[in-house]
Amino acid sequence: MVMDDYYFHDQKPELWAKINSLHLSYLEMEESPQKLDHKIKLDDCIKKFLCIAPHNQKFCFKETAEVLHRSASNKKDFSGYRAALGWNAIGMYAGNLISQPWRQEYRQIKMYSGFYKHEIEANLVGAEIMFEAMGYKHVGNGILVLEGPVCPDTVKYVSQDSLVAYVECQV
């Protein structure tokens, strides 16, 4: 009976809470060897979570699952490695927006820029919806603009989803 309780104990909520905590502290850390060690712990926790979570419970935003599915299904030369690069770029952008919301360069995304074309669009299909989830709006001519204050919680969850998708692409 005790063994049954152990095997059927749902670890997802505990792992998700640990991922939230590790991710938040990771975002607050300065670049250092300790931050790299912390990232390894965070990645390991995400891997454990991904092994037990059904696909519809892996992400905070449905958009994350949509971009991942669309990319794997529709990209002729899809590779998990390259998709991971795209997710990493989105996660880094979100992290920069959280840590430096006053910087004007994070308020506008030119979807024709080298960063967007080579890091995101080349590796993921329809990833602009991740930026829309952060509050960016299309203003025409391939430009996304973030007006008004940054919602740190929303951007944090986009960053976290990007990291979970990054690890998912590596598994």
Language-model features: locations:
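Ubiquitin-system adaptor modules
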Residues: 1-171
